[in-house]
Amino acid sequence: MSDSETIRQVLENTKIIALVGASPKPHRASYQVMQYLMHQGYDVYPVNPLKAGDTILGRSVVSTLDEVPVAIDMVDVFRNSVDAGDVVDDAIRVGAKSVWLQLGVINEPAEERAIEAGLAIVMDHCPAIEIPKLGIAPVA
């Protein structure tokens, strides 16, 4: 499910992103990707139960996907492969349209559950790499 056409469709049909595993530390990949996505015009909601109530890049951090105040287009997962399964299940439960597992994050049983539930899923890729590679225009 992580072919270029699927990646393009997910990115072009996404405006609202819940970024699970968001970090306030500028040297962390989750911070850098969140910053990049925001600069591309995506509306990004940081999710991290250990940082709930804090702010990252001017956005209030929530502890769970349930606390994101709008419908979620994509859940971007910065968790390890084992923990990603629970996040995929949460994404299914809250009605997200797609799930994106970052570089190095692969969970095939979770991928199957997402597909069965009708979600698009991308594994082992980074949107901050794929957007310029595919020439995806900023969100209007």
Short names for language-model regions:
Residues 59-64:
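Conserved SAM-binding strand-loop segment of SAM-dependent methyltransferases
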Residues 103-130, 137:
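Rossmann-fold NAD(P)-binding glycine/threonine-rich loop
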Residues 40-42, 94-99, 117-119:
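A short helix->loop->beta-strand "cap" motif at the edges of active sites that frequently abuts
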Residues 51-58, 70, 111-113:
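Short loop/helix-cap segments at secondary-structure boundaries that form the rim of catalytic
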Residues 1-14:
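Short N-terminal or domain-adjacent regulatory/targeting segments
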Residues 65-105:
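Mid-chain, well-packed structural core segment of small domains
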Residues 17-18:
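Conserved beta-strand elements of the Class I
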Residues 25-28, 35-55:
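NAD(P)-binding Rossmann-fold cofactor-contacting core
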